[in-house]
């Protein structure tokens, strides 16, 4: 029997769990939960997109400032590590359209460097932050792992390349790898200030400040928004699951439900007290129309079930931004 996500993950002699992109939204959340459970954690971030303020509360973690595009940095952070949670990336479709080369360096090159270092250091398992963007704009819903990927943005191409590298390293070198294809993750600590931020973070900041948010397109596009606690839960399950069940696998990570951006705006209007209407602008290059995950594979392999639904997650998110002064 494997460990559950609520049990200690265990340690090798040197006892490190590495979180890449630890100053980012998802990486910070995973590290915080590991520390809460008494685990020994090492984190790395280059602060290209990560925020130093996100390291507050993680003082028990060993932190290394470095760039995974540098192979030497990867060697340093993988020493003595058993499990890697690889969250570092330039996680933005619009940014990848503006800077495809930078996206490739910080997603593909960085991932390959990390995998080589992990293999050489004897790391047991790498859990990878995949992306639903690899499915592209195919009309079939829900998205299943058996569907042929059809990436339509440089970011999606980069994340898919990472998936293939992970699977190759498992098959060729025996490095255990698990890919979780995230669907529109949101929650506390997500940066609401950048043009490249997630839509819910931007909406929360603007609506709490009484500013008009912008919907790109007609607003009838839909997303399977996934609250951060569900993603952290899934990562811990993926780290603890028996090798025979998950090594070399990739699976969707979402709630299995979708909502349009127009309906999302209405929920946020209720939660924030915003009285205006959204602005509408032309669709952005690289954006997909609809997104909905089939999560049955994660349910079967990990025992995963969403632990926080969309509306409750959005309520918690709004309250966090309100308390943190996002207005």
Report residues per predicted region.
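N-terminal Rossmann-like NAD(P)+-binding domain of SDR-like oxidoreductases, especially those catalyzing
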Residues: 1-185, 308, 324
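C-terminal substrate-binding subdomain of Rossmann-fold SDR/epimerase-dehydratase oxidoreductases
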Residues: 6-9, 207-327
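Surface-exposed alpha-helical interface segments used for non-catalytic interactions
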Residues: 28, 32, 109-112, 164, ...
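A structural alpha-helix within SAM-dependent methyltransferase catalytic domains
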Residues: 35, 115-119, 167, 204, ...
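Conserved donor sugar-nucleotide recognition element shared by glycan-biosynthetic enzymes
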Residues: 154, 162, 196, 261, ...
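Hydrophobic alpha-helix immediately C-terminal to the catalytic Tyr-X-X-X-Lys motif of short-chain
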Residues: 161, 165, 169, 199, ...
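Conserved catalytic loops of nucleotide-sugar-dependent glycosyltransferases that act on lipid-linked
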Residues: 192, 196-199
């Amino acid at each position: 029997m494997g460990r559950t996500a609520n049990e200690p993950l265990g340690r090798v002699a040197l006892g490190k769990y590495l979180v890449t992109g630890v100053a980012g939204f998802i990486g910070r959340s995973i590290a915080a939960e590991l520390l809460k459970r008494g685990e020994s954690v090492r984190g790395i971030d280059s602060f290209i997109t990560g925020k130093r303020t996100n390291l507050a509360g993680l003082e028990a973690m060993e932190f290394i400032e470095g760039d995974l595009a540098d192979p030497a940095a990867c060697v340093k952070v993988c020493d003595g590590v058993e499990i890697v949670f690889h969250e570092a990336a330039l996680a933005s479709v619009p940014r990848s359209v503006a800077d495809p080369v930078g996206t490739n360096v910080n997603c593909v090159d960085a991932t390959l460097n990390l995998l080589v270092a992990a293999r050489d250091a004897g790391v047991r398992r790498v859990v990878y932050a995949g992306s639903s963007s690899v499915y592209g704009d195919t009309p079939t819903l829900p998205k299943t792992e058996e569907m042929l990927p059809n990436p339509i943005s440089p970011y999606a191409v980069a994340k898919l390349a990472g998936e293939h590298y992970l699977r190759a390293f498992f098959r060729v070198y025996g490095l255990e790898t698990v890919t979780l294809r995230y669907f529109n993750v949101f929650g506390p600590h997500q940066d609401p200030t950048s043009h490249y931020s997630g839509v819910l973070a931007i909406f929360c900041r603007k609506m709490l400040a009484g500013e008009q948010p912008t919907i790109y397109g007609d607003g009838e596009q839909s997303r399977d928004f996934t609250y951060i606690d569900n993603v952290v839960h899934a990562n811990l399950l993926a780290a603890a699951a028996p090798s025979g069940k998950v090594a070399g696998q990739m699976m969707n990570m979402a709630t299995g439900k979708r909502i349009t951006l127009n309906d999302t705006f209405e929920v946020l209007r209720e939660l924030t007290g915003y009285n205006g209407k959204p602005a509408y602008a032309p669709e952005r290059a690289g954006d997909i129309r609809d997104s909905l995950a089939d999560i049955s594979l994660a349910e079967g392999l990990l025992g995963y079930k969403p632990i926080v639904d969309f509306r409750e997650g959005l309520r918690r998110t709004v309250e966090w931004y309100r308390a943190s002064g996002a207005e």
